Amino acid sequence: MELRRCQPSDLQAIIDLNEIIYAALPDKSVLRHNSPEMIASCLEEPNVTLGVWDCNLLVAIGVLYVPQCIEEDHYHDLGLHGDYRPANQKLFLVREGYRGLGLQRQLIREVEKVAISRGYNLLCTTVAPNNAFSINNFLKEGYVYAKTEEKYGGLVRNLYYKTLIY
């Protein structure tokens, strides 16, 4: 398997992965249904989308996302004070059949490296409260629970953050 930065030419593969995963979810509240436009924005600077490929098959993604609107700006929800340059970890998707291989945790760490290289020192993420697998992965990677709130037009989400050390 190969980890690499996704390019605009990978957009359809990412959309397909998102749709396959979303369609298979028994509880749709676990994942926000992402529009093609939102996914395309994850490929545009200053955002970075990392993908794991098994030959020509996209099997997992993770996104470093720099918020452009208040709904996506989780830093302000934290109420932290200090010299922070925040960004978000967003949209971790792992194809069925590739789960349990540590790909989400690998992507979390790789997105952190990208964030540090770009000068970000605080990462925020949201996770559905009933998504124990993702919650455990973020906690194992040192993220701290902040609070539970309604986001994204009515979806309940736990908010987590991590201060990055250069």
PLM features: residue spans?
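A short beta-loop-alpha structural element at the N-terminal edge
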Residues: M1-D16, D27
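Conserved GNAT-fold acetyl-CoA-binding loop/helix
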Residues: I15, E19-S41
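Conserved acyl-donor/pantetheine-binding loop and adjacent beta-alpha core of acyl/acetyltransferases
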Residues: C55, I61-L91, Y152
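Conserved acetyl-CoA-binding loop-helix of GNAT-fold acetyltransferases
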Residues: V94, G100-K113, N136, K140
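Conserved beta-strand-loop-alpha-helix junction that forms the acyl-donor binding cleft
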Residues: R99, T125-I135, G153
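Conserved GNAT acetyl-CoA-binding A-motif
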Residues: A115-V127
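Conserved active-site alpha-helix within GNAT-family acetyltransferase domains
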Residues: S117, P129-T148
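C-terminal "cap" of GNAT-fold acetyltransferases
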Residues: E150-Y166
